[in-house]
Amino acid sequence: MKTYHAFVATLALAIGGALLCVGMGFGFGASSSSAGPNIEGTYMLEYRETADGKRVMAPEIVGMLSYSKNVRNFNVYWMMGGKQSSISMVAKYTLSDKEYIEDCMYYAENMDGKGITYNTAATHGVSPVTMKDGAIAFTPALHGEPMIAISKSGLIATKTGVFTDHWKKLD
């Protein structure tokens, strides 16, 4: 009887292990390395460091960035020198460990209070990707954007000689 129970317990363990392995193969557990890096999440702008070392925070600057599986939604507003500026964007993207590809569907900007401009013409950009110490970095090829470095804790956007924005990952 003990042998029978041991056999059943061993069989149950083996079946459970096999199911776990099959489940992982279908994406229920570990992710496939060929899927590329994952930047999905919502990021909130905490503060901007200007080139002269000044720290700018809300309400002078407010921003939110969301990456879903394949869509990016970006909104940022700032006030500098008494002039309001804002950028809003919706784009599809793909990301691998080698490149970031973006297809912009909507882009709007109001720079230095000059009035808003809209662009719904499809634009396409490809940027090389670098990965180091668990972070991914790239400079989106469209609209003169800053270099972006994303880690598990958040995102840092750097426009050399102009600003460095610090974004916290919310989810």
Please annotate each region the language model reported.
Residues 21-88, 96, 101-171:
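Lipid interaction determinants
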Residues 10-25:
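Bacterial N-terminal signal peptides
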Residues 1-5:
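Positively charged n-region of N-terminal signal peptides that target proteins for export
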